[in-house]
Amino acid sequence: MYTSHEDIGYDFEDGPKDKKTLKPHPNIDGGWAWMMVLSSFFVHILIMGSQMALGVLNVEWLEEFHQSRGLTAWVSSLSMGITLIVGPFIGLFINTCGCRQTAIIGGLVNSLGWVLSAYAANVHYLFITFGVAAGLGSGMAYLPAVVMVGRYFQKRRALAQGLSTTGTGFGTFLMTVLLKYLCAEYGWRNAMLIQGAVSLNLCVCGALMRPLSPGKNPNDPGEKDVRGLPAHSTESVKSTGQQGRTEEKDGGLGNEETLCDLQAQECPDQAGHRKNMCALRILKTVSWLTMRVRKGFEDWYSGYFGTASLFTNRMFVAFIFWALFAYSSFVIPFIHLPEIVNLYNLSEQNDVFPLTSIIAIVHIFGKVILGVIADLPCISVWNVFLLANFTLVLSIFILPLMHTYAGLAVICALIGFSSGYFSLMPVVTEDLVGIEHLANAYGIIICANGISALLGPPFAGWIYDITQKYDFSFYICGLLYMIGILFLLIQPCIRIIEQSRRKYMDGAHV
């Protein structure tokens, strides 16, 4: 599904040190790097796979709460949208805390969102617990997974990102089957409790994301509390713990009564030293945290808001408009296909092999095949990208016309294959803005995709509530998608016209 941040050049630091030229590390392109791929693969399964399977729960929520389809669709849309929208802002946590801590916290928040959602009394409760909480946790765990793969790989980065993101397709297939089974056997509330427990594995995946630099972080306050103190303070610490034994070694056995008197006299001094040390440690910790948060915020702010020149690039602005319309057309089938299956009485065939699973499996092959085709020297990446977009929008228009399982299966396969163009988005973005602005530009595109995922499914459900047909939902969303594609087509034409006019003006001056 989302390649999200494949090859986007994120360079967040797990430690607070300034970036330096790194020597070749034994784990680059090998060793522990493949554990990063495995960790990222399971993150994609647990996060993206479960989000693409939310159509199963959407049907259960409609039956439980008896709300409109438009309102109910907001639950899954919030979760999907927030996962993507918060991507650039999660960079602040990564700069401050590191990838490992961010991912572990994200796993806990995501699991908490699933568990609290099991006790929902209405749809509005789910907006907060599942849409916001689970979505935020997903975003916090997802971005570090992609960032760490990029940091551990240089020569094989494309292969590593491709392998890790295939977890989305596998996850969609597995999570759809799992949620259908859990809902049938235990009910949707217990299914969400179990899914919350499963989501705790995100913490395990996060624990595998160890920084490249071996050893402990020298800037950690717990490690430098003593070493970073003045010399006399360090001596005081040593003396308080070992003074009695030192005196015994240096001065012999001595008089026991004299030794007791000396220790009694020094107790107030030791207590004073301990208080001073405790206060000094607290001050050092607060100062260290303040500096680290400040540096992380400055890096994040300069990275995402210091590139206003990107918006002077009209092709990039057109690409943003495309992203605002495009992503919802991919998400809508996942959310509403289970309901369409029920409307057409195709549940028996769909139980054997769910339509959403067809999209997920073919999507894996689509990403690989389209990537290989786009790498051919005789083929333009833009042409492959546009052709895949046209195929996807055509499939969206045709889907409502299919009322049989076989017809829907063929269209779902086309949707899955053509949506593999998501693996080309980083390449297209780099062509537009250059490698130096790739990270920031791609973060903006992902935000636009998140807005599209947030608004698309509720809009389709709202249209169904008015017309009592899903046909118009797909037609209107497909039309909006076509408008986004037209933005991409118009801009090259404008560029050609401007170049021709410039050449004409230059010739006239000569």
From Swiss-Prot:
Membrane topology note: Multi-pass membrane protein
KW Hydrolase (keyword) present: no
Entry annotated with the keyword Cell membrane: yes
GO BP terms, alphabetized: carboxylic acid transmembrane transport
GO cellular-component term (any): plasma membrane
Subcellular location per the Swiss-Prot or TrEMBL entry: Cell membrane
Pfam families given in the database record: MFS_1
Region spans: Disordered: 214-255
Keywords: Cell membrane, Membrane, Symport, Transmembrane, Transmembrane helix, Transport
Membrane-spanning intervals of the chain: 28-48, 74-94, 103-123, 127-147, 159-179, 191-209, 315-335, 353-373, 379-399, 408-428, 443-463, 474-494
GO MF, one annotated term: monocarboxylic acid transmembrane transporter activity
Stretches with biased composition (Polar residues): 233-244
PANTHER family recorded: MONOCARBOXYLATE TRANSPORTER, MONOCARBOXYLATE TRANSPORTER 14
Biological role: Proton-linked monocarboxylate transporter. May catalyze the transport of monocarboxylates across the plasma membrane.
Name this protein carries in UniProt: Monocarboxylate transporter 14
Natural source organism: Homo sapiens (Human)
Encoding gene, per UniProt annotation: SLC16A14
